[in-house]
Amino acid sequence: MAQAQYAGTGRRKNAVARVRLVPGTGKITINKKDVEEYIPHADLRLVINQPFAVTSTQGSYDVFVNVVGGGYAGQSGAIRHGISRALLEVDPDFRDSLKRAGLLTRDARMVERKKPGLKKARKASQFSKR
């Protein structure tokens, strides 16, 4: 018989993460690399594990992630979002705790575009009155 798999898609900034949860030992694999190898920052690894901490399911599922776009922070946020959505498939009762922790909400903040005539999105050259 096939093993149960739960899928979820997460997005953050320019990153898109496709997440699969399989009952297992808690091993996280991102783009066929171990999480410690793929994401060098410990605080971002904590971000990825947040949904498991909130639902107290640490070590219950192996996580397989395919993530594209963005940098470390965006990808970590996308993975967290994807794991949260996949955990909803596992048990719909998790919705309350995940929603309260704000893990089901897609973070809509994006980089503001650079405007013509300015140096950056908002940085202008110094204004001279005279």
Swiss-Prot record:
Leader sequence segment: none
InterPro entries: Ribosomal_Su5_D2-typ_SF, Ribosomal_uS9, Ribosomal_uS9_bac/plastid, Ribosomal_uS9_CS, Ribsml_uS5_D2-typ_fold_subgr
Gene Ontology terms: cellular component: cytosolic small ribosomal subunit
GO biological process, one term: translation
UniProt keywords, alphabetically: Ribonucleoprotein, Ribosomal protein
KW Secreted (keyword) present: no
Gene Ontology terms for molecular function: RNA binding; structural constituent of ribosome
HAMAP family: Ribosomal_uS9_B
Sequence similarity: Belongs to the universal ribosomal protein uS9 family.
Protein name per its UniProtKB record: Small ribosomal subunit protein uS9
Gene: rpsI
